[in-house]
Amino acid sequence: MRSDVIKKGIERAPHRALFKAMGLTDEELDKPLIGIVNSFNELIPGHIHLRRIAEAVKTGVRMSGGTPLEFSTIGICDGIAMGHGGMKYSLPSRELIADSIEAVVRAYNFDGIVMIASCDKIIPGMLMAMARLDIPAIFISGGPMLPGRFKGEYVDVKTVFEAVGAVKAGKMSEKELKLLEDFACPGCGSCAGMFTANTMNALTEALGISLPWNGTAPAVYAHRIRIAKQTGMQIMKLVEEDLKPSDILTPEAFEDAIAVDMALGGSTNTVLHLMAIAREAGVKLTLDTFDEISEKTPTLVKISPAGKHFVLDLYEAGGVLAIMKRLSELGLIHEDRITVSLKTVGELLRDVSVLRDDVIRPVTRPYLSRGGLMILYGSLAPKGAVLKVSAIPDIETFEGEARVFDCEEDAVKAILSGDIEKGDVVVIRYEGPKGGPGMREMLAPTSAIAGMGLDRDVALVTDGRFSGATRGLSIGHVSPEAAEGGPIALVEDGDLIRIDVKAKRIDLLVDEEELKERKAKWKPKVKEVKGYLKRYSSLVTSANTGAVFRE
């Protein structure tokens, strides 16, 4: 066993003494030691219940002859960090999580590891560590939140964000907003729509590193506890077989995950996260990989913010495997690859049925003939930008005058003050990985635009990123970012910007000579940052490579 290095032989008597100080017996130390990474905290609705999940996992480990040992890592709620300086720490926390798990697992030489998380950056941080460590491992989430109910309609946290703009526009009273606030999020779990957290949870199934139903079984359902127990039992089988992440996280696994992502109309953040996980797994992904797969993958699902359904509906429709079953009809799924279930994808799909065609459409009548995410290039984004086409109105081209802001706060103030007009292109820059630093999510401005009824008439372009709850003509991850002197740094108020969805282009319609003059005068915008953000800014690479640390 891997763990023998810390528990076998007379030289390890001091080590055993320390384990015994925690109540462990010789019998427990003779068994495989399974690390349980639990990101429980009292700060995130998706993590508040993870102690219960961890206890069920540990029960499963013990049932199958292992000794579970739990430790923790950090987590940030993007919703609570949204719209202020705290969001600068969200994406950077991904690297901290990966590094912290690596440190503990290497120090203790576990025989296997179970990773428990529910929300945005914690999941990819854990999967990065999983790929890096390459010991038998399995992931389980805490499950999605149920949608709330307000005035006879299902709602979620996105509804509340957009309601702020509605109040400012006089379309909703503050009293109604308070009631909505009370009813929108009825309990624990990752937010009820297909935002970043639930997209990533779905993709753990598609990648094959979690058990069936992990991506969609609700947080409060007993099914979630059963999955947790099964996960604890399954890690023991993975240890016995010595099946490692490198056996599962293959190029084909990432291709399948991207196909599922596109069929789901998933969060734009998945582009960053899948590239980061793939890098740790030694698999090369580029923006073009995403676009190539998106071009041949139909959008089969529209879950909030793109449509009226929620993750609960997807669960009732058959879950992630039901989407993969549909995609397999088009030859878009590699059915011979192995998963943590110790079954191939094809074996898992054999008995799967789609239970609700209204949620997962047949491939013969998709919402879109292509996938939900699109990569744009052009003079404003020479190295690429990302658009969630599944969450935009039927717009093929948009041309408007730039309204330029050097931070999110200034843009939100202008939007809520009524200073943004129909036809404007809101440009928010110096919010990239280096320039923010931290690449904040722009949910506050996009929600304000949508809440004020301008989502068909105003575009937003940024070198920052977006929440999975964002909808409308919102283009993020513009690369190179402003802090690196990218073209977005040279945009001035009144410049024309043209977005051509059909041609997959975003262009700054300014004379080349004029841009050369502006470039000659440009100076980097210096921000005073300290501590981790200062180190992060010095190490992080561009969004078009996943905003990972340079080698």
Curated annotation (Swiss-Prot):
Keywords: 2Fe-2S, Amino-acid biosynthesis, Branched-chain amino acid biosynthesis, Iron, Iron-sulfur, Lyase, Magnesium, Metal-binding. Mg(2+) binds at residues 78, 120-121, 441. The active site is at 467 (proton acceptor). GO terms for biological process: isoleucine biosynthetic process; L-valine biosynthetic process. Its EC number is 4.2.1.9. Pathway: Amino-acid biosynthesis; L-isoleucine biosynthesis; L-isoleucine from 2-oxobutanoate: step 3/4; Amino-acid biosynthesis; L-valine biosynthesis; L-valine from pyruvate: step 3/4. InterPro entries: Dihydro-acid_dehy_C, DihydroxyA_deHydtase, DiOHA_6PGluconate_deHydtase_CS, ILV_EDD_C, ILV_EDD_N, IlvD/EDD_N. One of its GO terms (cellular component) is cytosol. Gene3D superfamilies: IlvD/EDD C-terminal domain-like (3.50.30.80). It comes from the Archaea. Its cofactor is [2Fe-2S] cluster; Mg(2+). [2Fe-2S] cluster binds at residues 119, 191. One of its GO terms (molecular function) is magnesium ion binding. It catalyses: (2R)-2,3-dihydroxy-3-methylbutanoate = 3-methyl-2-oxobutanoate + H2O; (2R,3R)-2,3-dihydroxy-3-methylpentanoate = (S)-3-methyl-2-oxopentanoate + H2O. Belongs to the IlvD/Edd family. Homodimer. Functions in the biosynthesis of branched-chain amino acids. Catalyzes the dehydration of (2R,3R)-2,3-dihydroxy-3-methylpentanoate (2,3-dihydroxy-3-methylvalerate) into 2-oxo-3-methylpentanoate (2-oxo-3-methylvalerate) and of (2R)-2,3-dihydroxy-3-methylbutanoate (2,3-dihydroxyisovalerate) into 2-oxo-3-methylbutanoate (2-oxoisovalerate), the penultimate precursor to L-isoleucine and L-valine, respectively. This is Dihydroxy-acid dehydratase. It comes from Pyrococcus abyssi (strain GE5 / Orsay).
